[in-house]
Amino acid sequence: MAAAAGGPCVRSSRELWTILLGRSALRELNQIEAELNKYWQRLLEGLSYYKPPSPSSAERVKANKDVASPLKELGLRVSKFLGLDEEQSVQLLQCYLQEDYRGTRDSLKTVLQDERQSQALTLKIADYYYEERTCILRCVLHLLTYFQDERHPYRAEYADCVDKLEKELVLKYRQQFEELYRTEAPTWETHGNLMTERQVSRWLVQCLREQSMLLEIIFLYYAYFEMAPSDLLVLTKMFKEQGFGSRQTSRHLVGGTMDPFVDRIGYFSALILVEGMDIESLHKYALDDRRELHQFAQDGLICQDMDRAMLTLGDIPHHAPVLLAWALLRHTLSPEETSSVVRKIGGTAIQLNVFQYLTRLLRSLASGGNDCTTSTACMCVYGLLSFALTSLELHTLGNQQDVIDTACEVLADPSLPELFWGTEPTSGLGIILDSVCGMFPHLLSPLLQLLRALVSGKSTAKKVYSFLDKMSFYNELHKHKPHDVLSHEDGTLWRRQTPKLLYPLGGQTNLRIPQGTVGQVMLDDRAYLVRWEYSYSSWTLFTCEIEMLLHVVSTADVIQHCQRVKPIIDLVHKVISTDLSIADCLLPITSRIYMLLQRLTTVISPPVNVIASCVNCLTVLAARNPAKVWTDLRHTGFLPFVAHPVSNMTQMISAEGMNAGGYGSLLMNSEQPQGEYGVTIAFLRLVTTLVKGQLGSTQSQGLVPCVMFVLKEMLPSYHKWRYNSHGVRELIGCLILELIHAILNLCQETELHSSHTPSLPSLCICSLAYTEAGQTVISIMGIGVDTIDMVMAAQPRSDGPEGQGQGQLLIKTVKLAFSVTNNVIRLKPPSNVVSPLEQALTQHGAHGNNLIAVLAKYIYHRHDPALPRLAIQLLKRLATVAPMSVYACLGSDAAAIRDAFLTRLQSKIEDMRIKVMILEFLTVAVETQPGLIELFLNLEVKDGSNGSKEFSLGVWSCLHVVLELIDSQQQDRYWCPPLLHRAAIAFLHALWQDRRDSAMLVLRTKPKFWENLTSPLFGTLSPPSETSEPSVLETCALIMKIICLEIYYVVKGSLDQSLKDTLKKFSSEKRFAYWSGYVKSLAVYMADTEGSSCTSLLEYQMLVSAWRILLIIAASHADVMHLTDMAVRRQLFLDVLDGTKALLLVAASVNCLRLGSMMCTLLLILLRQWKRELGAVEKILGPLTEILEGVLQADQQLMEKTKAKVFSAFITVLQMKELRVGDIPQYSQLVLNVCETLQEEVIALFDQTRHSLASDSAAEDKDSMETDDCPRPRHKDQRDGVCVLGLHLAKELCEVDEDGDSWLQVTRRLPILPTLLTTLEVSLRMKQNLHFTEAALHLLLTLARTQQGATAVAGAGITQSICLPLLSVYQLSSNGTGQTPSTSRKSLDAPSWPGVYRLSMSLMERLLKTLRYNFLTEALDFVGVHQERTLQCLNAVKTVQSLACLEEADHTVGFILQLSHFRKEWHFHLPQLMRDVQVNLGYLCQACTSLLHSRKMLQHYLQNKNGDGLPSAVTPRAQRPSTTTTTTTTTTALATPAGCSSKQPTADTEASEQRALHTVQYGLLKILSRTLAALRHFTPDVCQILLDQSLDLAEYNFLFALSFTTPTFDSEVAPSFGTLLATVNVALNMLGELDKKKESLTQAVGLSTQAEGTRTLKSLLMFTMENCFYLLISQAVRYLRDPAVHPRDKQRMKQELSSELSTLLSSLSRYFRRGAPSSPAAGVLPSPQGKATSLSKASPESQEPLIQLVQAFVRHVQR
């Protein structure tokens, strides 16, 4: 880019100036030294560094091939116009283009070709040239200012440079001064057509400014180095010739605007001559009586020449101090010789009003500019004044007040009052003090004016206080002799005969001159001035004076008394503002100020200046004790106030009921008409101080009317008021913005929207956003860079970096406007309506004159680096929040502004903070400003060889700079400190995050890009306790995130080789372990400091967050990241665990808890990812238990999510390995903790459910248009919520506790079960809290395993909680949480209301199984309540084979199986239901057999019918098997809600269909086996029916019809013997298929190995067959023994049975010979009675009894 700017150029003088000020990137001592060593010659040459044109130089320019010819031409024209050397002109042009040119390089070509544009450019270069010249002088001034200042960091470097300059500096600068005032003004003949009158005037201003600066340098030089007498003579003659600035060669051109410069030349001329006379050392020699040692005492000839020269002076004021000084010098050194000359010279000086002149001089110098020059001038004048007062009689020096004024100006230098109090009171300024004391308190003002000037530091303030506290004389004036005094003979002494009360109206505080007091009398203008010898404290006297004013306030004397009181108040203000501790002693005065304010504001024409002084005093007091000042002030009615408290913002903004107070009426009636605003300035400072002192406290609400007054009455209109003095308008604007800035800066975002009554910040935000106050702020921001530059250029003194001129005030105001606007936008509550402020900020104006363009152009400002920085910050804010295109707003200037941004960004000496802000702005723009970021990326596109587009970086691409900033290979990277490096990395991160592919593409191709980018990750950081630069952590965090984004988005194989190498290096150099250890040490450090001393919390959070993402990516892309070592993984996990533990144990620190919560997430993820590799579970459980305890002690609202994470981690750990109670540390305490948490959570859920129920019913009555503004609390029933996870954790812990003792103790200590069941009941009734309900049932199910647990659950009232409420689950309309039909196991396990019903059924089954008769009544109640659903479910299997339906049938049959053990009791209580269940079980058996028999039909069913929910619920079968009916009612009965898609799955392959089929088959088989087991309890026991003749057959119904045909699937045939035989056949066939391994049905079982699956299936099939045979035999004998059955039917049955069973037996025998499994009957079910127990042995031979039994039965039948 430098090349683009027209070649490299030397360091400009302005850059050198910036470096010396310490505002550049070069801030190290050695860098400053190097710069001074390099450029000291230029400083020595001064203005003569710039040479006049010469032919040889022109030739060299023409011959130079490195410079483009158009630039040469322009350079030569510039050379002629400025009268500057051609080579230097070209160099100047190049520097200008680099630093100040406001166009693009492309536009430069057109500018050079266009005559008018190139003329305008030449004029701008002239301005630049003038500033360059000035900057050389500024540099020298700066060196002279600080080279002896011990406090300055570069003092030694400056001193070395001044040593080099010392010898020749003054000589050269004096010559330059002479040249300047003798130079002829340029004309158009000599300098070309461009030299118009205006340009000549501009030149002359520059000439005068340079003269004044040269003289200032010479003056400062002579303050440090002695002037030879000969030099004084030369200078005197030179200044005389030049008329002390007034006799310029071009004086005919000097206009009124140039007078300040001419005056300055005169002032410095006079000061240089006075300084040259060395009056200070003369004073010392005179005191020591060694006058001959003074240099002028030794050089009589020069003294005579000087005398002659001095006698010719005296016609202009500038001569006065020179004449006075010379008269003193001659009078001291040779009083006899020169008495007449001295008298004449001295008289002339007095006639010229020397002291008035000196006062003017000092005020002019103090009004802005270099403090050092001002204080040096003060020292110079102090010496002169002290010596004059010591040497001459005071009355000979003219008007005493003038001397006092000069003394006060002199004492403005802080060091001089200290000096004064250290000197003899009889010499120097002590003489004036003594003189004014002689008139005190008759004349108050002179003494107080002088003492006010004598207060500069705390020690001097105490001296002034003591001085006034111990007065020994009281002076008063009498026109006539009082009658109560005795006079001495000669009348010079009076003695009081009676005591005198000095203030008759003074009240309690008073002064009394006692009887007998003596007073000296002086007659003065026919009046007696009496000096009473009376000791008193002036402070008491002042109190009396104020008291007097309060008494006369409504009389005509008020003005006179105000003149006496104002100096008192001013002195008090100065004393307490210097040393606030004295305020306590001055309480009698300060406490009366409030009353004074109250009284004075009501006077007809109020004394505005006194009121302003009073307010200033209160401002100082408010800094110390705002609450007291505010309370006392409120009673005075001075400040604006409201009659009634304001409750809302609308009232506030409208200023409803507001009273402007005493101040408001003063402003309207006195200040605005007069154009003087002392009270307004004081008022604004007071309110700002009060705001800073008590914002956030309750009293800040009382300040609302004051702030409202400022926002409504002052800010919108202050610029339209009438003003007498220049600069007051700007000051008021600045103070108003300072007030708003203080309010917005001190407020917390949390406070902003929390309070109900509007606060000060929200008032400011609302006013600025929605009223005309905001428009004023916008107009301030819109002043623009050109206006500011103009004001700065017009200042007589723009040299001081800390100057207080108009320009600096304007810059400060604009900066405040930026900051205020930025804060208003940041803090404004979100709204759908665009506020007028935002509208004005973002609207597009014609010709780029909108505010965005104005803001962007502040980049051209050079005086104060904070101004462009704040402008860019505001742009950044607007680019983030406002819906507009910055690029469009910039219009045609966009590219030029881009160039300016990049020029400053790439400059090696630019202030680092501006660079950071530019990069932050671009970082935001990546996401929000696509057009703008394309402009800055400046990517050039060309077509690649293979037809794809190739991108490359344009010349003006910001990526050049960014790549340079991250280049770790470069040496001496002073220009890239950590903050800037971080900003560059953040910009790259934004590109990656926003997926700017073209930019990423280019960056990836850059050599060593990944190496440079990641180099910080390979460094070693200092420990957290010593980290001085936290931005390094943020840098590393962003780099980690970039790597993660790259790995995540780029296909594994396509990663750059360079990145792969870097990742490999990261792993091989053990950086995982390093960073893991560092993050852990951060956590430990945070925990140790309890998060309190941590200033870099944000960076810590960023690093932890990035490390978390990196580890997550590394865990999922282990091969890419080379994180495959199990030991490393284990170590990383343990580090995370330790770090989390350290943080979460600091329950008192919110910061620690937040960071701990972040690490807890990582802990959980790693635990799940690496659970097989983490080794001993016990090592993890210990820290986890501690973490849980820490979390439970912390703020529960804050820890809600963290608690859930810890619970989740516990669940994961407990599932990793089967544990016993002894394996878990503090198991019982852990259980108690979990249950206590659960107790609270469940109660909260209960309350929330009830509340939502109440609010839902209330909401129905509300108008539908009403919206609820308050955010709803997070619902407790979350799948990952604490409550649900707590229940799951409790379940896991319960499973560990085999005998249930620990749980029994907990249930005794805590009412957890009743609470749980109550909430469960409400949830079921309302069909709400699905996740909770499911988790609670799982826990209860686990508890019910053990006898104790089951007893506890039953005892807590489980039936009442579940039985009736469960009806709601399938009777209420589904609220969208229904289950979609699916054949996948995963979706079946997802929480659903049908799942809740199934779980309830399982719970009942388990409780009945565990408690048996103790739970029977409840079980019968349950089956009675849910009988319809039970029967529907049994019937539905035939129609719907969805997993949900099969699962429910399985659970239902399981419950019936348990209940069937209690046949008699069931029959007694619910005979009809029992019969219906028996019938339906038979039909279910038939349906299962049919579906298992015909696989193709089942597959067809699955494909076509199961997409729908149950279209028709099959009604339960009637009692008699023969009459069966079906109705097609449309109630949604079972598992799936209607309306789900019935399309065939498109993407499912055959394999997945097969899997689904096998899952359904397995489900049907389970249902079938349980159905048969249950039916077995409803049929007579085989042994009993065969052997017991007395068996009551009526107890047992027929379960199967006497039919042997295999039933077809569609026909509604009653279940028969054919059904049972078919079932045996199906089971046998399936066994055969299993042996042949034809089908992979074993996978559906869900066991880990195929062998286990096969074993399970075989057992199940054998169990089914055994039960079939058992039922067959039992039912056959039941038929045979029943007399009601016709013998013919019995005979037919015997025949059919024997033939069918014989066939089956032969098949069975064949199967057993091959080897068959054992029956699981003994394990799964209560053993069948009698012989059947012998059927379930393990060895194949033992299977023969089954065959024997069947054979025996066949023989029995055949008889």
UniProtKB/Swiss-Prot annotation:
Residues 1523-1532 have a biased composition (Low complexity). GO terms for cellular component: nuclear envelope; nuclear pore. The modification N-acetylalanine is found at A2. Residues 1259-1277 have a biased composition (Basic and acidic residues). InterPro entries: ARM-type_fold, Nucleoporin_Nup188_N, Nup188, Nup188_N-subdom_III. Residues 1539-1549, 1730-1742 have a biased composition (Polar residues). One of its GO terms (biological process) is nucleocytoplasmic transport. Keywords: Acetylation, mRNA transport, Nuclear pore complex, Nucleus, Phosphoprotein, Protein transport, Translocation, Transport. Residues 1255-1277, 1508-1552, 1718-1743 are annotated as: Disordered. The modification Phosphoserine is found at S1719, S1727. The keyword Lyase does not apply. Transmembrane segments: none annotated. It is found in: Nucleus, Nuclear pore complex. GO terms for molecular function: structural constituent of nuclear pore. Its main location: nucleus. Component of the nuclear pore complex (NPC), a complex required for the trafficking across the nuclear envelope. Required for proper protein transport into the nucleus. Belongs to the Nup188 family. Part of the nuclear pore complex (NPC). This is Nucleoporin NUP188. It comes from Mus musculus.
